[in-house]
UniProtKB/Swiss-Prot annotation:
<dbReference type="GO" id="GO:0030246">
    <property type="term" value="F:carbohydrate binding"/>
</dbReference>
<dbReference type="InterPro" id="IPR006311">
    <property type="entry name" value="TAT_signal"/>
</dbReference>
<dbReference type="InterPro" id="IPR007444">
    <property type="entry name" value="Glucan_biosyn_MdoG_C"/>
</dbReference>
<dbReference type="GO" id="GO:0030288">
    <property type="term" value="C:outer membrane-bounded periplasmic space"/>
</dbReference>
<dbReference type="InterPro" id="IPR019546">
    <property type="entry name" value="TAT_signal_bac_arc"/>
</dbReference>
<dbReference type="InterPro" id="IPR011013">
    <property type="entry name" value="Gal_mutarotase_sf_dom"/>
</dbReference>
<comment type="pathway">
    <text>Glycan metabolism; osmoregulated periplasmic glucan (OPG) biosynthesis.</text>
</comment>
<dbReference type="Pfam" id="PF04349">
    <property type="entry name" value="MdoG"/>
</dbReference>
<dbReference type="GO" id="GO:0051274">
    <property type="term" value="P:beta-glucan biosynthetic process"/>
</dbReference>
<dbReference type="GO" id="GO:0003824">
    <property type="term" value="F:catalytic activity"/>
</dbReference>
<dbReference type="InterPro" id="IPR014756">
    <property type="entry name" value="Ig_E-set"/>
</dbReference>
<feature type="signal peptide" description="Tat-type signal">
    <location>
        <begin position="1"/>
        <end position="32"/>
    </location>
</feature>
<keyword id="KW-0732">Signal</keyword>
<dbReference type="InterPro" id="IPR023724">
    <property type="entry name" value="Glucan_biosyn_MdoD"/>
</dbReference>
<dbReference type="InterPro" id="IPR013783">
    <property type="entry name" value="Ig-like_fold"/>
</dbReference>
<comment type="function">
    <text>Probably involved in the control of the structural glucose backbone of osmoregulated periplasmic glucans (OPGs).</text>
</comment>
<keyword id="KW-0574">Periplasm</keyword>
Length: 551
Protein backbone atom coordinates (compact mmCIF):
# COMPACT_ATOMS: atom_id res chain seq x y z
CA UNK A 1 0.00 0.00 0.00
CA UNK A 2 1.50 3.32 -1.10
CA UNK A 3 1.22 6.24 1.32
CA UNK A 4 1.43 9.95 0.68
CA UNK A 5 4.31 11.87 2.18
CA UNK A 6 3.15 15.41 2.77
CA UNK A 7 5.62 17.94 4.10
CA UNK A 8 3.96 19.24 7.23
CA UNK A 9 3.20 22.94 7.42
CA UNK A 10 3.45 23.67 3.70
CA UNK A 11 1.61 20.46 2.68
CA UNK A 12 4.15 20.43 -0.11
CA UNK A 13 3.60 17.05 -1.70
CA UNK A 14 0.00 16.79 -2.92
CA UNK A 15 -1.37 13.47 -4.16
CA UNK A 16 -1.89 13.12 -7.91
CA UNK A 17 -5.41 12.20 -9.07
CA UNK A 18 -8.36 13.23 -11.29
CA UNK A 19 -9.26 16.29 -13.36
CA UNK A 20 -12.20 18.61 -13.14
CA UNK A 21 -13.96 17.67 -16.35
CA UNK A 22 -15.85 20.98 -16.40
CA UNK A 23 -14.04 22.85 -19.16
CA UNK A 24 -17.07 22.67 -21.44
CA UNK A 25 -19.31 24.24 -18.80
CA UNK A 26 -17.33 27.41 -18.09
CA UNK A 27 -15.64 29.18 -21.00
CA UNK A 28 -12.74 31.55 -20.57
CA UNK A 29 -12.72 35.25 -21.37
CA UNK A 30 -10.11 37.95 -21.82
CA UNK A 31 -8.97 39.72 -18.68
CA UNK A 32 -11.50 42.34 -17.63
CA UNK A 33 -10.38 45.88 -16.88
CA UNK A 34 -12.23 45.63 -13.58
CA UNK A 35 -11.01 45.74 -9.96
CA UNK A 36 -12.86 42.44 -9.44
CA UNK A 37 -10.36 39.61 -10.00
CA UNK A 38 -13.12 37.41 -11.45
CA UNK A 39 -12.66 37.85 -15.20
CA UNK A 40 -14.57 34.97 -16.79
CA UNK A 41 -17.94 34.95 -18.50
CA UNK A 42 -21.00 34.74 -16.26
CA UNK A 43 -22.71 31.39 -15.82
CA UNK A 44 -25.58 30.40 -13.56
CA UNK A 45 -24.54 28.43 -10.49
CA UNK A 46 -26.06 26.92 -7.37
CA UNK A 47 -25.59 23.72 -5.38
CA UNK A 48 -28.13 21.78 -7.45
CA UNK A 49 -26.20 22.66 -10.60
CA UNK A 50 -23.00 21.40 -8.96
CA UNK A 51 -24.72 18.14 -8.01
CA UNK A 52 -25.82 17.64 -11.61
CA UNK A 53 -22.30 18.45 -12.74
CA UNK A 54 -20.80 15.81 -10.43
CA UNK A 55 -23.45 13.27 -11.45
CA UNK A 56 -22.76 13.80 -15.16
CA UNK A 57 -19.01 13.72 -14.61
CA UNK A 58 -19.32 10.28 -13.00
CA UNK A 59 -20.78 8.96 -16.26
CA UNK A 60 -17.57 9.83 -18.09
CA UNK A 61 -14.10 8.32 -17.86
CA UNK A 62 -11.64 9.86 -15.44
CA UNK A 63 -9.12 11.98 -17.31
CA UNK A 64 -6.11 10.79 -15.39
CA UNK A 65 -2.94 12.50 -14.25
CA UNK A 66 -2.52 16.28 -14.55
CA UNK A 67 -0.70 17.82 -17.45
CA UNK A 68 2.93 18.88 -16.96
CA UNK A 69 3.70 22.21 -15.35
CA UNK A 70 6.00 24.79 -16.92
CA UNK A 71 9.58 23.87 -16.03
CA UNK A 72 10.02 26.94 -13.84
CA UNK A 73 7.24 25.66 -11.56
CA UNK A 74 7.87 21.91 -11.75
CA UNK A 75 11.44 22.19 -10.45
CA UNK A 76 10.76 24.46 -7.48
CA UNK A 77 12.13 23.67 -4.04
CA UNK A 78 9.86 23.95 -0.98
CA UNK A 79 11.76 27.06 0.09
CA UNK A 80 11.23 28.71 -3.30
CA UNK A 81 7.56 27.76 -3.36
CA UNK A 82 6.93 29.16 0.10
CA UNK A 83 8.50 32.49 -0.88
CA UNK A 84 5.71 33.14 -3.42
CA UNK A 85 3.10 35.44 -1.92
CA UNK A 86 -0.36 36.30 -3.13
CA UNK A 87 -0.87 40.04 -3.60
CA UNK A 88 -3.17 41.01 -0.73
CA UNK A 89 -4.42 44.00 -2.73
CA UNK A 90 -5.96 41.53 -5.18
CA UNK A 91 -7.62 39.27 -2.62
CA UNK A 92 -11.02 37.78 -3.38
CA UNK A 93 -13.11 39.99 -1.09
CA UNK A 94 -10.81 43.01 -0.98
CA UNK A 95 -13.60 45.32 -2.19
CA UNK A 96 -16.21 44.12 0.33
CA UNK A 97 -17.14 46.89 2.75
CA UNK A 98 -16.26 46.18 6.39
CA UNK A 99 -14.90 42.80 5.42
CA UNK A 100 -14.10 40.48 8.31
CA UNK A 101 -12.92 37.68 6.04
CA UNK A 102 -10.75 37.53 2.95
CA UNK A 103 -9.42 34.82 0.66
CA UNK A 104 -6.18 34.34 -1.25
CA UNK A 105 -5.05 31.62 -3.63
CA UNK A 106 -2.05 29.29 -3.61
CA UNK A 107 0.23 29.21 -6.64
CA UNK A 108 0.74 26.08 -8.71
CA UNK A 109 4.17 24.48 -8.49
CA UNK A 110 6.44 21.88 -6.96
CA UNK A 111 4.22 18.93 -5.91
CA UNK A 112 1.03 20.88 -6.57
CA UNK A 113 0.37 19.92 -10.17
CA UNK A 114 -3.40 19.49 -10.26
CA UNK A 115 -5.11 22.52 -11.76
CA UNK A 116 -7.81 23.86 -9.43
CA UNK A 117 -10.30 26.33 -10.88
CA UNK A 118 -11.76 29.17 -8.83
CA UNK A 119 -15.09 30.96 -9.30
CA UNK A 120 -16.70 33.94 -7.61
CA UNK A 121 -20.47 33.71 -7.11
CA UNK A 122 -22.99 36.47 -6.53
CA UNK A 123 -25.37 34.75 -4.08
CA UNK A 124 -28.19 37.18 -4.98
CA UNK A 125 -28.19 36.45 -8.72
CA UNK A 126 -26.58 32.96 -8.61
CA UNK A 127 -24.18 34.07 -11.33
CA UNK A 128 -20.58 32.85 -11.27
CA UNK A 129 -17.45 34.13 -12.98
CA UNK A 130 -14.15 32.29 -13.16
CA UNK A 131 -10.97 33.74 -11.72
CA UNK A 132 -8.20 32.97 -14.18
CA UNK A 133 -4.56 32.70 -13.25
CA UNK A 134 -2.24 35.56 -14.15
CA UNK A 135 1.21 36.31 -12.73
CA UNK A 136 0.23 39.79 -11.53
CA UNK A 137 -1.89 38.20 -8.79
CA UNK A 138 1.32 37.09 -7.06
CA UNK A 139 4.58 38.47 -5.69
CA UNK A 140 7.40 36.11 -6.63
CA UNK A 141 10.09 37.63 -4.38
CA UNK A 142 13.14 35.32 -4.34
CA UNK A 143 11.36 32.27 -5.75
CA UNK A 144 13.39 32.37 -8.96
CA UNK A 145 10.30 31.85 -11.14
CA UNK A 146 10.69 32.71 -14.83
CA UNK A 147 7.40 34.59 -15.23
CA UNK A 148 7.87 34.69 -19.01
CA UNK A 149 7.01 30.99 -19.01
CA UNK A 150 3.70 31.87 -17.35
CA UNK A 151 2.56 34.49 -19.84
CA UNK A 152 -0.63 33.46 -21.61
CA UNK A 153 -1.18 30.61 -19.12
CA UNK A 154 -4.61 31.81 -18.00
CA UNK A 155 -5.81 28.20 -17.72
CA UNK A 156 -2.98 27.24 -15.34
CA UNK A 157 -5.34 27.49 -12.39
CA UNK A 158 -4.40 27.54 -8.73
CA UNK A 159 -3.29 24.98 -6.14
CA UNK A 160 -5.80 25.91 -3.44
CA UNK A 161 -6.89 28.76 -1.22
CA UNK A 162 -6.73 30.10 2.30
CA UNK A 163 -8.98 32.41 4.30
CA UNK A 164 -8.01 35.16 6.73
CA UNK A 165 -10.04 36.74 9.50
CA UNK A 166 -9.88 40.26 10.94
CA UNK A 167 -7.89 41.66 12.62
CA UNK A 168 -5.30 39.38 11.00
CA UNK A 169 -6.40 39.97 7.38
CA UNK A 170 -3.54 38.99 5.04
CA UNK A 171 -1.34 38.04 8.01
CA UNK A 172 -2.47 34.77 9.60
CA UNK A 173 -4.94 32.45 7.90
CA UNK A 174 -7.57 30.44 9.72
CA UNK A 175 -8.66 28.02 6.96
CA UNK A 176 -6.62 26.35 4.23
CA UNK A 177 -7.55 24.01 1.35
CA UNK A 178 -4.40 22.74 -0.35
CA UNK A 179 -3.42 19.48 -2.04
CA UNK A 180 -5.78 16.70 -3.21
CA UNK A 181 -8.89 17.10 -0.99
CA UNK A 182 -6.98 18.13 2.15
CA UNK A 183 -8.07 21.06 4.28
CA UNK A 184 -7.28 22.44 7.74
CA UNK A 185 -8.39 25.09 10.19
CA UNK A 186 -7.21 26.59 13.47
CA UNK A 187 -8.63 27.73 16.77
CA UNK A 188 -7.68 30.97 18.52
CA UNK A 189 -4.02 29.91 18.74
CA UNK A 190 -3.60 30.22 14.94
CA UNK A 191 -1.61 26.97 15.09
CA UNK A 192 -2.34 24.42 12.38
CA UNK A 193 -2.24 20.74 13.29
CA UNK A 194 -4.12 17.78 11.90
CA UNK A 195 -5.92 17.80 8.53
CA UNK A 196 -9.27 16.69 7.18
CA UNK A 197 -10.00 15.35 3.71
CA UNK A 198 -13.00 15.40 1.43
CA UNK A 199 -12.92 11.62 1.02
CA UNK A 200 -10.67 8.60 1.58
CA UNK A 201 -10.59 5.63 -0.78
CA UNK A 202 -8.94 2.25 -0.18
CA UNK A 203 -6.84 3.50 2.72
CA UNK A 204 -6.36 -0.02 4.07
CA UNK A 205 -7.00 -2.57 1.32
CA UNK A 206 -4.92 -4.65 -1.06
CA UNK A 207 -5.41 -1.90 -3.67
CA UNK A 208 -3.37 1.27 -4.02
CA UNK A 209 -4.79 4.11 -1.96
CA UNK A 210 -6.63 6.67 -4.06
CA UNK A 211 -6.56 10.39 -3.29
CA UNK A 212 -9.50 12.32 -4.77
CA UNK A 213 -8.98 15.95 -5.72
CA UNK A 214 -11.04 19.05 -5.21
CA UNK A 215 -10.76 20.36 -8.77
CA UNK A 216 -12.89 23.51 -8.57
CA UNK A 217 -14.25 25.88 -5.92
CA UNK A 218 -17.13 28.37 -6.06
CA UNK A 219 -17.13 31.15 -3.44
CA UNK A 220 -20.29 32.99 -2.46
CA UNK A 221 -19.28 36.62 -2.04
CA UNK A 222 -19.04 37.21 1.68
CA UNK A 223 -21.44 39.69 3.27
CA UNK A 224 -20.14 42.90 4.90
CA UNK A 225 -19.23 42.26 8.52
CA UNK A 226 -19.83 38.51 8.22
CA UNK A 227 -17.56 35.90 9.78
CA UNK A 228 -19.25 33.03 7.93
CA UNK A 229 -18.65 32.13 4.29
CA UNK A 230 -19.84 29.43 1.91
CA UNK A 231 -17.70 27.63 -0.62
CA UNK A 232 -18.69 24.80 -2.95
CA UNK A 233 -16.31 22.18 -4.32
CA UNK A 234 -16.24 19.60 -7.09
CA UNK A 235 -14.44 16.39 -6.15
CA UNK A 236 -13.08 14.02 -8.79
CA UNK A 237 -11.06 10.81 -8.87
CA UNK A 238 -10.79 7.55 -10.77
CA UNK A 239 -13.52 5.89 -8.68
CA UNK A 240 -15.92 8.63 -7.62
CA UNK A 241 -17.10 12.21 -8.04
CA UNK A 242 -18.73 14.51 -5.52
CA UNK A 243 -20.45 17.84 -4.95
CA UNK A 244 -19.58 19.52 -1.65
CA UNK A 245 -20.98 22.51 0.19
CA UNK A 246 -18.95 23.99 3.05
CA UNK A 247 -20.54 26.61 5.29
CA UNK A 248 -17.61 27.79 7.39
CA UNK A 249 -18.06 29.75 10.61
CA UNK A 250 -14.87 31.52 11.69
CA UNK A 251 -15.67 32.12 15.34
CA UNK A 252 -13.50 33.75 17.98
CA UNK A 253 -12.13 30.57 19.54
CA UNK A 254 -12.88 27.93 16.91
CA UNK A 255 -13.77 27.22 13.29
CA UNK A 256 -16.94 25.24 12.60
CA UNK A 257 -17.63 23.73 9.18
CA UNK A 258 -21.03 22.47 8.08
CA UNK A 259 -20.37 19.96 5.32
CA UNK A 260 -22.87 18.49 2.89
CA UNK A 261 -21.77 16.15 0.13
CA UNK A 262 -23.40 14.19 -2.68
CA UNK A 263 -21.23 11.34 -4.00
CA UNK A 264 -21.47 9.42 -7.28
CA UNK A 265 -19.46 6.21 -7.70
CA UNK A 266 -17.76 5.58 -11.02
CA UNK A 267 -16.52 2.15 -9.95
CA UNK A 268 -16.90 -0.42 -7.21
CA UNK A 269 -14.99 0.79 -4.15
CA UNK A 270 -13.58 -1.58 -1.55
CA UNK A 271 -13.27 0.98 1.22
CA UNK A 272 -14.98 4.37 1.28
CA UNK A 273 -13.91 6.73 4.07
CA UNK A 274 -16.32 9.52 5.07
CA UNK A 275 -15.15 12.59 7.03
CA UNK A 276 -11.54 11.37 7.03
CA UNK A 277 -8.86 13.06 9.09
CA UNK A 278 -5.09 12.70 9.12
CA UNK A 279 -2.80 13.39 12.06
CA UNK A 280 0.61 12.60 13.56
CA UNK A 281 1.57 10.69 16.68
CA UNK A 282 5.26 10.02 17.26
CA UNK A 283 5.37 9.63 21.04
CA UNK A 284 3.38 10.50 24.13
CA UNK A 285 2.85 9.53 27.76
CA UNK A 286 1.88 6.00 26.72
CA UNK A 287 4.41 5.44 23.93
CA UNK A 288 8.03 6.43 24.52
CA UNK A 289 9.80 4.16 22.05
CA UNK A 290 10.42 6.91 19.48
CA UNK A 291 11.05 9.76 21.94
CA UNK A 292 14.86 9.84 21.95
CA UNK A 293 14.65 13.62 21.80
CA UNK A 294 14.58 16.56 24.16
CA UNK A 295 10.82 16.75 23.72
CA UNK A 296 8.79 14.64 26.19
CA UNK A 297 5.90 14.29 23.73
CA UNK A 298 5.54 14.78 19.97
CA UNK A 299 2.05 14.54 18.48
CA UNK A 300 -0.72 16.48 16.74
CA UNK A 301 -3.35 14.33 18.47
CA UNK A 302 -3.20 12.06 21.50
CA UNK A 303 -6.42 10.04 21.22
CA UNK A 304 -9.38 8.93 19.18
CA UNK A 305 -12.60 9.79 20.99
CA UNK A 306 -15.89 8.13 20.02
CA UNK A 307 -19.45 8.80 21.12
CA UNK A 308 -21.26 5.69 19.98
CA UNK A 309 -24.82 5.49 18.77
CA UNK A 310 -25.79 3.61 21.96
CA UNK A 311 -24.46 6.48 24.09
CA UNK A 312 -21.17 4.86 25.17
CA UNK A 313 -18.11 7.10 25.23
CA UNK A 314 -14.76 5.58 24.24
CA UNK A 315 -11.22 6.90 24.64
CA UNK A 316 -8.62 5.19 22.46
CA UNK A 317 -5.06 6.54 23.04
CA UNK A 318 -3.00 6.62 19.85
CA UNK A 319 0.11 4.53 19.17
CA UNK A 320 3.21 4.66 17.01
CA UNK A 321 3.44 0.91 16.36
CA UNK A 322 6.39 -0.97 14.94
CA UNK A 323 4.04 -2.55 12.39
CA UNK A 324 1.13 -0.90 10.58
CA UNK A 325 -2.14 -1.42 12.43
CA UNK A 326 -5.75 -0.97 11.31
CA UNK A 327 -8.67 -1.25 13.72
CA UNK A 328 -12.36 -0.92 12.87
CA UNK A 329 -14.86 -0.05 15.61
CA UNK A 330 -18.41 -1.07 14.73
CA UNK A 331 -21.24 1.38 15.32
CA UNK A 332 -24.76 2.31 14.23
CA UNK A 333 -25.57 5.98 13.68
CA UNK A 334 -22.57 7.34 15.61
CA UNK A 335 -23.15 10.53 17.55
CA UNK A 336 -19.61 11.78 16.98
CA UNK A 337 -15.90 10.99 16.82
CA UNK A 338 -12.63 12.81 16.48
CA UNK A 339 -8.89 12.99 16.94
CA UNK A 340 -8.23 15.12 19.99
CA UNK A 341 -5.26 17.01 21.40
CA UNK A 342 -6.36 17.52 25.00
CA UNK A 343 -3.00 18.05 26.71
CA UNK A 344 -2.40 21.82 26.36
CA UNK A 345 0.51 22.13 28.81
CA UNK A 346 3.68 23.46 27.13
CA UNK A 347 5.91 21.76 29.69
CA UNK A 348 4.69 18.38 28.45
CA UNK A 349 6.10 19.10 24.97
CA UNK A 350 8.91 21.67 25.38
CA UNK A 351 8.70 22.49 21.67
CA UNK A 352 9.07 26.13 20.61
CA UNK A 353 8.95 25.24 16.90
CA UNK A 354 6.07 22.78 16.66
CA UNK A 355 3.96 24.23 19.50
CA UNK A 356 2.09 20.95 19.86
CA UNK A 357 0.37 22.23 22.98
CA UNK A 358 -1.52 24.72 20.77
CA UNK A 359 -2.71 22.34 18.07
CA UNK A 360 -6.47 21.96 17.60
CA UNK A 361 -8.66 18.94 18.06
CA UNK A 362 -11.08 17.90 15.31
CA UNK A 363 -14.55 16.56 16.15
CA UNK A 364 -17.04 15.13 13.63
CA UNK A 365 -20.74 15.44 14.37
CA UNK A 366 -23.01 13.57 11.90
CA UNK A 367 -26.04 15.67 10.95
CA UNK A 368 -28.03 12.92 9.25
CA UNK A 369 -28.40 9.19 9.89
CA UNK A 370 -25.24 7.37 8.84
CA UNK A 371 -26.54 3.90 9.59
CA UNK A 372 -24.30 0.93 10.26
CA UNK A 373 -20.58 0.99 9.69
CA UNK A 374 -17.23 1.31 11.39
CA UNK A 375 -14.88 4.01 12.60
CA UNK A 376 -11.57 3.01 11.08
CA UNK A 377 -8.25 3.89 12.71
CA UNK A 378 -4.95 3.31 10.94
CA UNK A 379 -1.65 3.78 12.77
CA UNK A 380 1.53 3.74 10.68
CA UNK A 381 5.06 3.39 12.06
CA UNK A 382 6.99 6.65 11.88
CA UNK A 383 10.44 7.72 12.99
CA UNK A 384 9.64 11.39 13.43
CA UNK A 385 7.19 14.25 13.27
CA UNK A 386 7.35 15.14 9.56
CA UNK A 387 5.04 12.35 8.36
CA UNK A 388 1.35 12.04 9.15
CA UNK A 389 0.88 8.48 10.40
CA UNK A 390 -2.65 8.50 11.82
CA UNK A 391 -5.78 8.16 9.67
CA UNK A 392 -9.37 8.01 10.91
CA UNK A 393 -12.70 7.89 9.04
CA UNK A 394 -16.23 6.49 8.94
CA UNK A 395 -16.77 3.51 6.63
CA UNK A 396 -20.40 2.66 5.76
CA UNK A 397 -21.32 -1.00 6.08
CA UNK A 398 -22.94 -1.11 2.65
CA UNK A 399 -20.57 -2.02 -0.16
CA UNK A 400 -20.09 0.67 -2.80
CA UNK A 401 -20.98 -0.34 -6.36
CA UNK A 402 -20.55 1.58 -9.59
CA UNK A 403 -23.52 3.89 -10.07
CA UNK A 404 -24.30 4.20 -6.36
CA UNK A 405 -25.15 7.62 -4.96
CA UNK A 406 -24.66 8.78 -1.36
CA UNK A 407 -25.29 11.93 0.66
CA UNK A 408 -23.68 12.77 3.99
CA UNK A 409 -24.09 15.78 6.23
CA UNK A 410 -21.77 16.49 9.13
CA UNK A 411 -20.25 19.28 11.18
CA UNK A 412 -16.54 19.69 11.88
CA UNK A 413 -15.31 21.48 14.99
CA UNK A 414 -11.73 22.75 14.96
CA UNK A 415 -11.12 23.77 18.57
CA UNK A 416 -9.03 23.18 21.67
CA UNK A 417 -11.80 21.07 23.21
CA UNK A 418 -14.58 19.15 21.45
CA UNK A 419 -18.07 20.69 21.71
CA UNK A 420 -19.32 17.75 23.80
CA UNK A 421 -17.69 15.42 26.28
CA UNK A 422 -18.57 12.40 28.35
CA UNK A 423 -20.61 13.38 31.45
CA UNK A 424 -18.96 10.48 33.31
CA UNK A 425 -15.35 10.31 34.45
CA UNK A 426 -12.96 10.84 31.55
CA UNK A 427 -9.52 9.49 30.71
CA UNK A 428 -6.91 12.19 31.30
CA UNK A 429 -3.73 10.26 30.48
CA UNK A 430 -2.33 6.80 29.85
CA UNK A 431 1.16 5.74 30.93
CA UNK A 432 3.12 2.53 30.50
CA UNK A 433 6.37 1.23 31.92
CA UNK A 434 8.16 -1.55 33.75
CA UNK A 435 5.89 -3.74 35.87
CA UNK A 436 6.24 -6.49 38.41
CA UNK A 437 7.17 -4.42 41.48
CA UNK A 438 5.28 -2.56 44.23
CA UNK A 439 4.41 1.07 43.52
CA UNK A 440 7.13 3.31 44.96
CA UNK A 441 9.89 0.72 44.64
CA UNK A 442 10.82 1.48 41.01
CA UNK A 443 12.64 -0.94 41.07
CA UNK A 444 15.18 -0.74 43.90
CA UNK A 445 18.45 -2.70 44.16
CA UNK A 446 17.43 -5.36 41.68
CA UNK A 447 14.99 -5.86 38.85
CA UNK A 448 11.77 -7.88 39.24
CA UNK A 449 12.24 -11.61 38.79
CA UNK A 450 9.28 -11.90 36.45
CA UNK A 451 8.73 -9.65 33.44
CA UNK A 452 5.50 -7.60 33.24
CA UNK A 453 4.26 -4.37 31.69
CA UNK A 454 2.58 -1.73 33.85
CA UNK A 455 -0.35 0.43 32.73
CA UNK A 456 -1.56 3.51 34.60
CA UNK A 457 -4.75 5.21 33.44
CA UNK A 458 -5.82 8.48 35.07
CA UNK A 459 -9.55 9.30 35.28
CA UNK A 460 -10.93 12.73 36.21
CA UNK A 461 -14.34 14.37 36.46
CA UNK A 462 -17.76 12.81 36.64
CA UNK A 463 -18.97 11.50 40.01
CA UNK A 464 -15.70 9.88 41.11
CA UNK A 465 -15.65 11.63 44.49
CA UNK A 466 -19.21 10.59 45.29
CA UNK A 467 -18.51 7.05 44.13
CA UNK A 468 -15.29 6.58 46.10
CA UNK A 469 -16.91 5.90 49.52
CA UNK A 470 -19.21 3.35 47.88
CA UNK A 471 -16.36 1.59 46.10
CA UNK A 472 -14.86 2.09 42.65
CA UNK A 473 -14.34 -1.09 40.66
CA UNK A 474 -12.19 -1.21 37.51
CA UNK A 475 -13.61 -3.64 34.95
CA UNK A 476 -10.71 -4.88 32.81
CA UNK A 477 -10.99 -7.11 29.74
CA UNK A 478 -7.95 -8.44 27.86
CA UNK A 479 -7.73 -10.34 24.58
CA UNK A 480 -4.74 -12.25 26.01
CA UNK A 481 -2.59 -12.30 29.11
CA UNK A 482 -3.54 -11.51 32.70
CA UNK A 483 -4.00 -8.31 34.71
CA UNK A 484 -2.47 -8.42 38.21
CA UNK A 485 -1.44 -5.97 40.92
CA UNK A 486 -4.56 -3.90 40.23
CA UNK A 487 -4.56 -0.71 42.30
CA UNK A 488 -6.86 2.29 42.66
CA UNK A 489 -4.93 5.40 43.70
CA UNK A 490 -6.26 8.88 44.43
CA UNK A 491 -4.09 11.53 42.75
CA UNK A 492 -4.53 14.83 44.57
CA UNK A 493 -2.84 17.15 41.99
CA UNK A 494 -5.38 16.16 39.33
CA UNK A 495 -8.22 15.46 41.79
CA UNK A 496 -8.74 12.13 40.07
CA UNK A 497 -8.03 8.43 40.32
CA UNK A 498 -5.31 6.31 38.76
CA UNK A 499 -6.11 2.73 37.85
CA UNK A 500 -2.89 0.79 37.73
CA UNK A 501 -2.34 -2.82 36.69
CA UNK A 502 0.44 -5.07 35.45
CA UNK A 503 0.00 -7.15 32.32
CA UNK A 504 1.58 -10.62 32.39
CA UNK A 505 1.82 -12.70 29.21
CA UNK A 506 0.34 -16.20 29.21
CA UNK A 507 1.87 -17.23 25.87
CA UNK A 508 4.77 -16.43 23.56
CA UNK A 509 2.49 -14.63 21.10
CA UNK A 510 3.48 -11.17 19.90
CA UNK A 511 0.02 -10.41 18.51
CA UNK A 512 -1.43 -7.08 19.66
CA UNK A 513 -3.26 -7.25 22.98
CA UNK A 514 -6.61 -5.46 22.99
CA UNK A 515 -7.33 -3.94 26.39
CA UNK A 516 -10.63 -2.54 27.58
CA UNK A 517 -11.43 -0.91 30.91
CA UNK A 518 -14.12 1.17 32.53
CA UNK A 519 -14.99 2.11 36.11
CA UNK A 520 -18.06 0.77 37.88
CA UNK A 521 -19.79 1.64 41.15
CA UNK A 522 -22.51 -0.59 42.56
CA UNK A 523 -23.12 -2.08 39.14
CA UNK A 524 -23.29 1.19 37.18
CA UNK A 525 -20.66 2.53 34.78
CA UNK A 526 -19.17 5.77 36.10
CA UNK A 527 -16.55 6.43 33.39
CA UNK A 528 -16.00 6.38 29.69
CA UNK A 529 -14.44 3.22 28.25
CA UNK A 530 -10.68 3.09 27.82
CA UNK A 531 -9.49 1.06 24.83
CA UNK A 532 -5.85 0.33 24.21
CA UNK A 533 -3.70 -1.83 21.98
CA UNK A 534 -0.43 -3.12 23.39
CA UNK A 535 2.29 -4.80 21.35
CA UNK A 536 4.18 -7.40 23.44
CA UNK A 537 7.88 -7.89 22.78
CA UNK A 538 9.24 -11.20 21.54
CA UNK A 539 9.72 -13.83 24.28
CA UNK A 540 13.51 -13.36 24.32
CA UNK A 541 13.00 -9.66 25.05
CA UNK A 542 10.80 -10.27 28.09
CA UNK A 543 13.55 -9.88 30.61
CA UNK A 544 15.23 -7.07 32.49
CA UNK A 545 18.92 -6.51 31.81
CA UNK A 546 21.01 -4.94 34.55
CA UNK A 547 23.82 -3.21 32.64
CA UNK A 548 25.17 -1.16 35.54
CA UNK A 549 28.93 -0.99 35.94
CA UNK A 550 29.70 -0.90 39.68
CA UNK A 551 33.50 -0.77 39.53
Amino acid sequence: MDRRRFIKGSMAMAAVCGTSGIASLFSQAAFAADPDIADGQTQRFDFSILQSMAHDLAQTAWRGAPRPLPDTLATMTPQAYNSIQYDAEKSLWHNVENRQLDAQFFHMGMGFRRRVRMFSVDPATHLAREIHFRPELFKYNDAGVDTKQLEGQSDLGFAGFRVFKAPELARRDVVSFLGASYFRAVDDTYQYGLSARGLAIDTYTDSKEEFPDFTAFWFDTVKPGATTFTVYALLDSASITGAYKFTIHCEKSQVIMDVENHLYARKDIKQLGIAPMTSMFSCGTNERRMCDAIHPQIHDSDRLSMWRGNGEWICRPLNNPQKLQFNAYTDNNPKGFGLLQLDRDFSHYQDIMGWYNKRPSLWVEPRNKWGKGTIGLMEIPTTGETLDNIVCFWQPEKAVKAGDEFAFQYRLYWSAQPPVHCPLARVMATRTGMGGFPEGWAPGEHYPEKWARRFAVDFVGGDLKAAAPKGIEPVITLSSGEAKQIEILYIEPIDGYRIQFDWYPTSDSTDPVDMRMYLRCQGDAISETWLYQYFPPAPDKRQYVDDRVMS
